[in-house]
Amino acid sequence: MVKRNFFSFFFILLIPAAGMAQDWPQAFTIELEEVTYTEWPALQSAAAASHNGRWFLLGGRTGGLHGLFPPNTFPLDEANQAIHMLDPQTGAFWSRSVYELPDSIAVPLRATNAAHVHIGDYLYIMGGYGQDMDDSSMVTFNTLIAVDLAGLEPAMESEADIQPYFRMLRDSVFYQCGAEAEVMYHDGQPLVYLIGGHTFTGEYTQIGLGFEQHYRNNMQLFSIEDDGATLAITAPVTMEDSLLYHRRDFNVAPIISKTAANGEALVALSGVFQYDANLPWLNSFEIFKDADDSVRAVMAEMEHRFNNYTCPVMVMYDSLLQRNHLLLFGGISQFVYNTATASVVEDLNVPFTADISVVTRIDSAVDATTAYTQDLLPVRFEGLYGSNAAYFPAPDFPKYSNGVLKLPEARTPLLAGYLFGGIDPEIPNFGPSTATNTLYEVWLTYTAPIASLSDAAAEDVRIYPNPAQDFISVFVPGEGKVLLEWVNVVGETVQTETVFSGMAATIAVPDAAGVYLLQITDMAGAQRVLKKILVY
């Protein structure tokens, strides 16, 4: 049975609220359609991967938010003890018990908040927090589990033996929970970035007694060497930073970067906890490779107020305006939108939220600088959705090699991805919660913004070369579309072009030699700039 519900997120609405995106140029619209398969398992905080149109989810929890006071704050019967394969097209699903595997693999597969990466046909699951081998105590695991998705898929369908498709090794590198892992390619080879996290031994309690906890305060870089039989890693490179990497339960996402040597970077967003308060970090940082092949992490100039904990993140790049847009769906947030007062308020209890925000990274059109902003979308989830839910990209949406969506390709509505599962709380703070099997389709449409030339003086428009023979390069300040019209000496418009301002555009000159006026007009027709050009 499929439960359907449809609602849209239009990126511009005039809502007079601080932090809302009412003054932003409209770059896209988002539409969400709920397509929940009611028979699917409810799950949160799982390691997830997509392969051959099927989704695989391992680990995590089948209950809601963990308890705050002992005993049994992470009960074993709420640990996910199954391996799930889901088909979003048909609603079919298959589940197998982890106990079909050796205990050395089955036990860490019951853990929650493990880091994971998907490389080729393999899902690699690192660490996590859960009950140990004899179910007597709570521990952090030091395991790397390799899951052969290409082999596991037919075994799940045919009820064949699944054990050949799981392998495991132990190493202190993986001794963590709450870390985030991503992959960037160096010289064509995947390099794993394992960022932040902590080790936690003993039963969790909010009063801070009876357990040992240590933040890792580092980022470790290594390659996984896997020929399908032997599993190993290269010697890790460890980067220490007691500010940047002192966080857990956050989000890390790939972006397109003009400043990085290989054209891509990672952004680590918010997370918890600050040294002197049980509050999220209101900052984020960028990780990239320099021209000398060294890796750097740099704080982003932005106050990250919304969607502070792990939640689904969808990343799009607008190559025309040179902007990354990172959509953060729900979760847990220190700042929330108050519908009664139509304003953003701070809640130091850090509640579950229905808010959806967009973090935008803006590349300068004229130099190597970048800027970050974060805004709330003017439409919210109907419920408190998103905490520890999974995001799956749609396989057919055009993407860059690092998985970032090519935003301008969505000139008509395209299915961009899915949101699945997560925690389903009844109220924002201190209330009961369960895991959910809610499933959303995310539809994306690119809508190019309209430029305004009202502040663009004629001297700010740059044209080269002039005189010109075949082509010219035109740079118009601002953002959005502008109309270029070639007008000859008798006042006839002989050629028109539509280009985007804020970036250089190369256009052909008219075929006939002569003197022309290039008339540059914003799409509202409110402002014009004239430039005289000699074509020979």
Sequence positions of predicted segments:
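Beta-propeller blade signature
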Residues: N72-G91, S137-A155, I207-G228, P280-S294, ...
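Beta-propeller and closely related beta-sheet repeat lectin domains
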Residues: Q44-A47, R110-H116, C177-E182, R248-A253, ...
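C-terminal outer-membrane/trafficking sorting elements
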Residues: D455-Y464, A468-Y536
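Asp-box/WD-like beta-propeller blade repeats and closely related beta-sheet repeat scaffolds
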Residues: L109-N113, Q131-Y185
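Beta-propeller domains
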Residues: D23-T36, A47-E100, D132-T140, D148-E157, ...
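Residue-level signature of beta-propeller blades and closely related beta-rich strand-turn architectures
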Residues: R61-G63, Y129-Q131, H198-F200, V272, ...
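Loop/turn-rich, solvent-exposed surfaces of beta-rich toroidal or solenoidal domains
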Residues: F306-V404
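Blade-edge beta-strand/turn elements of extracellular beta-propeller
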Residues: D23-T36, G91-S104, A150-S172, I224-L243, ...
